[in-house]
């Protein structure tokens, strides 16, 4: 027998050794048991998850309610706590028990609580921050608040514990719970500063042309009292509380207000402040909100007027905010806005450095109480420019420093512009309006304004720029460079066509009122 056969015989005999076979089988069983244990663990975990989900699905629903107060909390001789609480469940007040797991000391008024099917408080939840919005009308001494809704209906509410120490002022907006019992949160206010254009103007009276008479009047009304207070005191003369600038649109009312703020600042040595707000921006559909914004504007003016700093409060489009009450022309919102404005205006007498200037295209629509002496004392009519004033205005925008037509100066071009604009012939006839048997021809001269003159000059400048771009710097005999008389007349033609289209597309009567015109019979 060879050596290879002997080794094979020994290996076979060893493989048939009972101990080795038993050890091998034990290893296999151990591996199977380990795998079964893992499978059993996974199955147990899955069973637990399924049971938890089943318990969740089978759990009764919880009802949300609002906590009012702890009604009773005591401990008997066995050490068992007995506690109950008063809650608001919808509009129903109920007294319900507290679960032993709920700490009564951690429940505050207005807080949300959860009730189980047996009407037991089993948990608390966050105080809701959504619900009906109300405006605070009055704060009572005991901490309660009088609030009003959009319709003006008033009610008394209490503070939830979450806002017990939060400062709440009149006019603040608050969120109340659905039952109308608790204030849950205070909303951030819409700041009047968001509506104000607050600036230090750099416009002076020298920048305004054609309004010498109006400038002289507003200097006397506003600038003298600010800069010569000692003389006014000696003569027992009070400064006017306000000035109303009225007249057709686009004729410099805002520029005059800015210029007076600039002049007052220069005279006082401090930076003057120009607070500008448009009347329609103050109108708000929520009751009391417009009045609150008016109060905030005057409060802001008072803050800025410290240390002799002059402040101009400029209210544009005043006729939209302070319309005549009781005429049926406006909604009843003016019945509260006008008195609030008058109250603030009457209080301006204690503010030596605050002046109110209003601007309006329709003085006939402003409430008479606003216009009476002692309120807006000075009324200045900013009229449409005549030919002399139009020449002065045009020269502010058309100067010799601009690239002009060779051989022409700014005076000659401005005079040509004004002559063309004030012609009363068919080429400048915008429309013939007829209302209730009265006919009138409306010409460009009837609606000319400072804004229109500037627009015409800008049109001519644009035409000159386009010509420069098209032809470059090459001079051509057939088309002179710069602002030419021909381009100015083309600009007037463009303005004429634009205004004629506007008249034809609008109601004639309304257009006349907006532009402060009347239909006087003139034989046209």
UniProtKB/Swiss-Prot annotation:
Keywords: ATP-binding, Coiled coil, Nucleotide-binding. InterPro entries: AAA+_ATPase, AAA_ATPase_domain, ATPase_AAA_core, ATPase_AAA_CS, NA-bd_OB-fold, P-loop_NTPase, Prot_ATP_ID_OB_2nd, Prot_ATP_ID_OB_N. One of its GO terms (molecular function) is ATP binding. The keyword Nucleotide-binding applies. ATP binds at residues 250-255. GO terms for cellular component: proteasome complex. Residues 22-59 form a coiled coil. Residues 1-29 are annotated as: Disordered. GO terms for biological process: modification-dependent protein catabolic process; proteasomal protein catabolic process. It comes from the Bacteria. Signal peptide: none annotated. Homohexamer. Assembles into a hexameric ring structure. Belongs to the AAA ATPase family. This is AAA ATPase forming ring-shaped complexes. It comes from Bifidobacterium animalis subsp. lactis (strain BB-12).
């Amino acid at each position: 027998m060879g050596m290879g056969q002997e080794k094979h015989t020994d290996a076979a005999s060893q493989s048939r050794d009972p101990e080795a076979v038993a050890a091998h089988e034990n290893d296999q069983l151990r591996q199977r048991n380990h795998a079964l244990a893992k499978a059993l663990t996974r199955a147990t975990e899955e069973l637990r998850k399924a049971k938890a989900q089943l318990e969740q699905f089978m759990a009764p629903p919880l009802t949300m309610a609002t906590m009012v107060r702890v009604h009773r909390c005591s401990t008997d001789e066995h050490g068992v706590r007995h506690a109950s609480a008063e809650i608001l469940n919808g509009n129903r007040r109920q007294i319900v028990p507290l679960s032993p797991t709920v700490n009564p000391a951690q429940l505050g008024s207005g807080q949300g609580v959860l009730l189980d099917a047996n009407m037991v408080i089993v948990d608390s939840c966050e105080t809701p921050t959504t619900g009906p919005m109300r405006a605070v009308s009055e704060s009572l001494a005991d901490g309660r608040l009088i609030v009003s809704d959009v319709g003006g209906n008033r009610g008394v509410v209490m503070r939830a514990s979450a806002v017990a120490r939060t400062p709440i002022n009149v006019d603040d907006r608050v969120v109340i719970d659905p039952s109308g019992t608790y204030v849950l949160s205070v909303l951030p206010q819409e700041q009047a500063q968001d509506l104000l254009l607050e600036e230090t103007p750099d416009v002076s009276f020298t920048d305004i042309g054609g309004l010498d008479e109006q400038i002289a009047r507003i200097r006397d009304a506003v600038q003298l009292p600010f800069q010569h207070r000692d003389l006014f005191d000696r003569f027992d003369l009070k400064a006017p509380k306000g000035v109303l600038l009225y007249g057709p649109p686009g004729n410099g009312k805002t520029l005059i207000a800015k210029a007076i703020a600039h002049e007052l600042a220069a005279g006082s040595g401090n930076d003057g402040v120009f607070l500008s707000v448009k009347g329609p921006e103050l109108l708000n559909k929520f009751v009391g909100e417009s009045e609150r914004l008016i109060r905030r504007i005057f409060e802001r003016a008072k803050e800025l007027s410290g240390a002799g700093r002059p402040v101009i409060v400029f209210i544009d489009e005043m006729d939209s905010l302070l319309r005549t009450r009781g005429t049926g022309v406006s909604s009843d919102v003016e019945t509260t806005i006008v008195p609030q404005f008058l109250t603030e205006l009457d209080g301006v007498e204690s503010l030596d450095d605050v002046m109110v200037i209003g601007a309006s295209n329709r003085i006939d629509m402003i409430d008479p109480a606003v216009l009476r002496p002692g309120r807006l004392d000075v009324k200045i009519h900013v009229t449409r420019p005549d030919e002399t004033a139009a020449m002065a205005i045009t020269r502010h925008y058309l100067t010799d420093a601009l690239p002009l037509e060779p051989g022409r100066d700014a005076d000659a071009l401005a005079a040509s512009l004004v002559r063309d604009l004030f012609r009363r012939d068919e080429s400048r006839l915008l429309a013939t309006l007829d209302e209730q048997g009265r006919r009138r021809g409306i010409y460009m001269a009837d609606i000319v304004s400072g804004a229109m003159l500037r627009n015409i000059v800008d049109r001519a400048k644009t035409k000159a720029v386009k010509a420069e771009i098209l032809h470059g710097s090459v001079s051509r005999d057939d088309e002179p460079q710069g602002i030419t008389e021909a381009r100015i007349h083309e600009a007037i033609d463009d303005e004429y066509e634009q205004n004629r289209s506007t008249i034809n597309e609008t109601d004639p009567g309304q257009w006349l009122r907006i532009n402060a015109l009347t239909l006087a019979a003139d034989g046209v």
